[in-house]
Amino acid sequence: MQQFLHSMKHYAIFFAVIAALTYVLTLVLGADKVDLDKYSTVTITKGDTLWELSNKYHNHHHLTTNEFVKWVEDVNDLNSDTAQSLSPGDKLYIPVLKKELHNQVAIEQ
């Protein structure tokens, strides 16, 4: 009987450790997720580049041009090659909060 309790104790500890690791990994991996519902999207037109978009929206974000480009590449799953071959009609998330653009449009009207 004592051996049974001893092995059950080991199983309980094992599953507790697995549960704790799963919880921690969920928190760590989920921390990098961006709530895209808060961010604006832009539709690419002919000749647009990520650097130009950064400059166009510079009053609406507080990133350097390189940080802006990196954010757009990461969130939209672009690499350097695909970022340079954007096509008209492509839609991209940009690091500009929707409410920032909405407030600016309201002020200008």
Swiss-Prot record:
InterPro entries: Cell_div_suppressor_YneA, LysM_dom, LysM_dom_sf. One of its GO terms (biological process) is division septum assembly. The keyword Cytoplasm applies. It comes from the Bacteria. PROSITE patterns: LYSM. GO terms for cellular component: cytoplasm. It is found in: Cytoplasm. Keywords: Cell cycle, Cell division, Cytoplasm, DNA damage, DNA repair, Septation, SOS response. Disulfide bonds: none annotated. It holds the Pfam family LysM. Gene3D superfamilies: LysM domain. Residues 40-94 form the LysM domain. Inhibits cell division during the SOS response. Affects a later stage of the cell division protein assembly, after the assembly of the Z ring, by probably suppressing recruitment of FtsL and/or DivIC to the division machinery. Belongs to the YneA family. This is Cell division suppressor protein YneA. It comes from Priestia megaterium (strain DSM 319 / IMG 1521) (Bacillus megaterium). The gene is yneA.
